[in-house]
From Swiss-Prot:
Subunit structure: Homotetramer.
Gene: gbkr1
Main location: plastid
Protein name per its UniProtKB record: 3-oxoacyl-[acyl-carrier-protein] reductase 1, chloroplastic
Source organism per UniProt: Brassica napus
PROSITE patterns, A to Z: ADH_SHORT
Alphabetical UniProt keywords: Chloroplast, Fatty acid biosynthesis, Fatty acid metabolism, Lipid biosynthesis, Lipid metabolism, NADP, Oxidoreductase, Plastid, Transit peptide
Keyword DNA damage: no
Reaction(s) catalysed (UniProt annotation): a (3R)-hydroxyacyl-[ACP] + NADP(+) = a 3-oxoacyl-[ACP] + NADPH + H(+)
Annotated GO CC locations: chloroplast
Domain of life of the organism encoding this protein: Eukaryota
Family per record: Belongs to the short-chain dehydrogenases/reductases (SDR) family.
C-alpha cells in the first residue's frame, strides 16, 4: 500500500513539472463613435509554446507540495502590454488578462485616473499591473513603454494593440489633418508597437500579438474613409507580420469587432438603436467582454498556438 501511494505522488509531481507554460482557460465588441452618427465608428474592428495561468499552476503545485513536501519550480505569469486600456474594449481586455494571471501594462493617452482604476482592479484579482501614459503613434513613447514593461518584469510575452480614434466626416469634407490623425494612431501606432514587440519576441523565439481592427476595415462605412483605411491596413499589415514572425514562433492575429455596447450607444435614442440593431443578424450589441474573451483565447490558450495571420470578426453577423 505504501509503495502504491508513493508511486502516485511521484507521478503527480512529474505531471505538474511537465506543465511548463500550459494554460487551461476558456474563451469568454464595435466601439462607439465619437459622434452621434449611426455608423461603424461604433464598430471597433478593434506561440506554439503556450503561456500558463498562474492560478492553475499554483493550485496543482500546492496539491503536490502538500502530499510530497517538495517544492515545485515556479511558473512565471505572462507579461502583457495592452494599449488604449483605460476604458471600453481595452479596459475589458486588460481586466480579462489580469484576471487570468497575467502581469499587465495598462497604456493610456489621457485618462490617467481611469487607467489607475483598471490597474487597481487587476491587483484586486491578485494580479500585477502598472500604468503607462504615452502616445503610441510616437516612436519614443513606444520604446519607453516597452522598456517600462521589461524593467518591471524582465520580458514581454503578449502585446494587444487596441488604441484608436475616430475623426468622422464624409470623404469630400474630410481634412487632411483628420486623415492624418486617424492613420497615425490607428495604423502607424500598430506598426510601431508590433515592430518593437517583435524585436523582443524574436530573441526569445516566442510571442503573441493581437491587433484590434474593425469590421469597417472589411466592409467600409459612410463617413469613415480614414478609419476604414486604417483598419484595413491593420489587417494587411498583421498578415505580413504573421508571415515574418512565424519562423520565430510569433503568432499575429486580428480581432474585428462590430457594434459594442458603451456609454455612447446608450445615448443614441430608441429610434436610432432600432435602425442599428436592424443591421445586426443577432439583433443585439456585443459586450466588451465578448471581445476580451476572444483576445484572451488568442493570447493565452494552447489551442490558439496554431492560429496566425487570421482576422476574426466578432460582430453579431454584420459581415456575413
Amino acid at each position: 500500500m505504501a509503495t502504491t501511494v508513493a508511486a502516485t505522488k511521484l507521478t503527480s509531481l512529474k505531471a505538474v513539472k511537465k506543465l511548463g507554460f500550459r494554460e487551461i482557460r476558456q474563451v469568454r465588441q464595435w466601439s462607439p463613435l465619437q459622434s452621434a452618427m449611426p455608423h461603424f465608428g461604433m464598430l471597433r474592428c478593434g506561440s506554439r509554446q503556450s503561456f500558463a495561468t498562474s492560478t492553475v499552476v499554483k493550485a496543482q503545485a500546492t496539491a503536490v507540495e502538500q502530499s510530497t513536501g517538495e517544492a515545485v519550480p515556479k511558473v512565471e505569469s505572462p507579461v502583457v502590454v495592452v494599449t488604449g486600456a483605460s476604458r471600453g474594449i481595452g479596459k475589458a481586455i486588460a481586466l480579462s488578462l489580469g484576471k487570468a494571471g497575467c502581469k499587465v501594462l495598462v497604456n493610456y493617452a489621457r485618462s490617467a485616473k481611469e487607467a489607475e482604476e483598471v490597474s487597481k482592479q487587476i491587483e484586486a484579482y491578485g494580479g500585477q499591473a502598472i500604468t503607462f501614459g504615452g502616445d503610441v503613434s510616437k516612436e519614443a513613447d513606444v520604446e519607453a513603454m516597452m522598456k517600462t514593461a521589461i524593467d518591471a518584469w524582465g520580458t514581454i510575452d503578449v502585446v494587444v494593440n487596441n488604441a484608436g480614434i475616430t475623426r468622422d466626416t464624409l470623404l469630400i469634407r474630410m481634412k487632411k489633418s483628420q486623415w492624418d490623425e486617424v492613420i497615425d494612431l490607428n495604423l502607424t501606432g500598430v506598426f510601431l508597437c508590433t515592430q518593437a514587440a517583435t524585436k523582443i519576441m524574436m530573441k526569445k523565439r516566442k510571442g503573441r500579438i493581437i491587433n484590434i481592427a474593425s469590421v469597417v476595415g472589411l466592409i467600409g462605412n459612410i463617413g469613415q474613409a480614414n478609419y476604414a483605411a486604417a483598419k484595413a491596413g491593420v489587417i494587411g499589415f498583421s498578415k505580413t507580420a504573421a508571415r515574418e514572425g512565424a519562423s520565430r514562433n510569433i503568432n499575429v492575429n486580428v480581432v474585428c469587432p462590430g457594434f459594442i455596447a458603451s456609454d455612447m450607444t446608450a445615448k443614441l435614442g430608441e429610434d436610432m438603436e432600432k435602425k442599428i440593431l436592424g443591421t445586426i443578424p443577432l439583433g443585439r450589441y456585443g459586450q466588451p467582454e465578448d471581445v476580451a474573451g476572444l483576445v484572451e483565447f488568442l493570447a493565452l490558450s494552447p489551442a490558439a498556438s496554431y492560429i496566425t495571420g487570421q482576422a476574426f470578426t466578432i460582430d453579431g453577423g454584420i459581415a456575413i
